[in-house]
Amino acid sequence: MQITLSFATTADGYLDDNSPRRLMISTPEDWEAVLRLRASHDAILAGAETLRRDDPALLLRDAAARELRRARGMRPDLTKVTLTHSGRLSPSMRFFTEGDAYRYVFSEKELPELKGVAEVISSDGSITASAIVTELEKRGVERLLVEGGASVLRMFLA
């Protein structure tokens, strides 16, 4: 599997701060590049903390990119992936409610509240990058874009 890590940092190395508001580091040009990068992948992974803080939909909004994916026999939206240790995810999050995508949640807990909105892949122990890759490969994912915060990035770099 091809795995791409996507993140932005400040000049002094910060990914984010501890404020409740999202720290905007990227420029509009950066976001255009991120959207092109998203379009070239099968799946996108963001951690549960990102979902709770930012409530992203993780969609491709560019009509040309969506049409190109359709022409290649792909769904217009990327497969969405997240992981949670705490299980604190609401089925009303945009991750679950917006777009036409497969959705996978890797969790250390059973999450019956997500039945019908995502496939929950339970872990017997801790969630690892290797286990995520193995399960996603079984589901046909060949190119994974990881838009992680520090914890998720560390997991995939270890």
PLM features: residue spans?
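Short, intrinsically disordered, charge-balanced linker/junction segments flanking boundaries
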Residues: F156-A158
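Active-site ligand-binding patch in enzyme domains
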Residues: Q2-E142, S151-R154
